[in-house]
Regions:
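Short helix-coil junctions and helix-kink-helix linkers
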Residues: 1-3
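Basic amphipathic alpha-helical segments that dock to polyanions
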Residues: 5-19
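Short amphipathic beta-strand starts and helix->beta connectors
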Residues: 14-16, 45-51, 77-82
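Short secondary-structure junctions
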Residues: 18-21, 90-91
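Accessory beta->alpha helical hairpin/"wing" motif in late/C-terminal subdomains of nucleic-acid enzymes
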Residues: 22-46
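Residue-level detector of family-conserved "landmark" positions at structurally sensitive sites
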Residues: 23-24, 93, 120
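Exposed, interaction-prone assembly regions rather than primary DNA-binding/catalytic cores
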Residues: 53-116
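Long, low-complexity, charge-rich intrinsically disordered regions
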Residues: 99-144
Length: 144
């Protein structure tokens, strides 16, 4: 694991408040999982993984975007297959949408394939051509 990649992961953990840092008198640093970090430190059965589907949709779209280099083609193809197998909608070649929260599962998958630096996860309130997604997932936009 290279140092730049490790720093990026640690920075993400700080932002999400998953780890805390303590510095000892001799200057060494210790990273410790916070309670939130411990709750996120979950394991999945990769082959049987399923995404939770709540009773009601909150109107938010969860998006996975990636740009995985050709030298990691196996990981790119495996990630695509996994997202489709989990029920994601392929919005574009490397853009996948899902109507429910799935950040923990996506974090696990990208770590499993070792492609975190090439994958982004986001949440959208609205997107153009939403009708196609609503039809695919058999949803109606929630009324306020």
């Amino acid at each position: 694991m290279n140092k730049i990649y490790l720093r990026q992961i640690v920075r993400e953990f700080y932002v999400d408040r998953l780890v805390s840092e303590q510095e000892s008198a001799d200057g060494t640093k210790t990273l410790t999982l916070t309670e939130k970090g411990k709750r996120r430190a979950i394991s999945f059965n990769f082959g049987r993984m399923k995404l939770k589907v709540p009773d009601t949709w909150d109107g938010l779209w969860h998006i996975v975007i990636f740009d995985i280099p050709e030298k990691y083609k196996w990981a790119r193809l495996s990630l695509r297959d996994k997202l489709l197998g989990l029920g994601f909608f392929q919005y574009q070649k490397s853009v996948y949408m899902y109507p429910h929260a799935c950040r923990d599962e996506i974090d696990f998958i990208v770590e499993f394939f070792k492609v975190r630096r090439f994958v982004r996860y986001g949440v959208l309130k609205e997107i153009t051509n939403e009708a196609e997604l609503l039809l695919y997932f058999n949803l109606q936009r929630p009324t306020s």
